[in-house]
Design a protein with these regions (language model features):
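A contiguous, low-structure linker/loop signature
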Residues: 64-102, 118-126
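Short, low-complexity intrinsically disordered segments
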Residues: 25-28, 51, 67, 73, ...
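Segments that shape or occlude catalytic/ligand-binding pockets
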Residues: 37-62, 66
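Active-site loop segments of alpha/beta catalytic cores
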Residues: 1-34, 43, 47, 54, ...
Length: 206
């Protein structure tokens, strides 16, 4: 029998202490179950029960961040095949003016608060839960058909894009608080492809 439970191990590592063994986790998408809260939660819970990871990194559908701003998808029925994007919120530079702060009751955001609460109920307090959240720039990058479009818009209208990033940041700052209230212990804060000079210079990123 292990000396420590999953939460003990994670808290010891955070405190700079050495647990009885390394703490590990693995995550993946279950595309065929991602189009609703219950399916997403069940997939994560089943994966946890199968392998007994030390923490759960929730892997929701990536575009939950932008659906409430107008992203539309065709849901995949294949466990290993991504959803098909069929409409993007941003088609031209003027469309950025439509991006405002979202209420947390918005459909996709509220749905994923439910995902967190269902997983917490399913695995209990001993397993720390991290919810995936992208940076504002990464979220903006999912609103366009081609990331190069965002880079071009950033060069053309930097003040406009910075204002949009502020609205995205405000939305997800409030959302992070609600995720904690729903049962999340922390965030997996992802830059996705934007932490690369292949996409944008360090100066522009700053």
């Amino acid at each position: 029998m292990d000396k420590y439970n999953h939460r003990d191990r994670i808290e010891m590592i955070i405190a700079g202490e050495k647990p009885d063994r390394f703490a590990g986790s693995v995550w993946r998408h279950f595309f065929h179950k991602e189009n609703n809260a219950r399916g997403t939660a069940e997939a994560m819970i089943d994966f946890q029960k199968m392998f007994d990871w030390d923490f759960i990194k929730i892997n929701p559908r990536a575009d939950y961040h932008v659906e409430d701003w107008g992203m539309k998808q065709k849901w995949s029925r294949d466990e290993f095949k991504k959803h098909e994007k069929i409409e993007f919120p941003i088609k031209n530079i003027q469309d950025w003016k439509k991006i405002d702060v979202l209420p947390l009751s918005s459909k996709a955001l509220a749905e994923h608060l439910k995902v967190v609460s269902l997983i917490k109920k399913g695995v209990g307090k001993e397993v720390p839960i991290l919810m995936t959240m992208f940076t504002p720039l990464a979220i903006a990058g999912r609103m366009v058909p081609d990331r190069k479009m965002l880079v071009a818009h950033l060069r053309e209208e930097p003040e406009l894009i910075h204002a949009v990033l502020d609205r995205i940041a405000e939305t997800f700052s409030k959302y992070a608080t609600e995720l904690r209230n729903a049962g999340a212990d922390g965030l997996f804060f992802a830059t996705t492809q934007w932490a690369s000079e292949d996409m944008i210079t360090w100066e522009k990123y700053q």
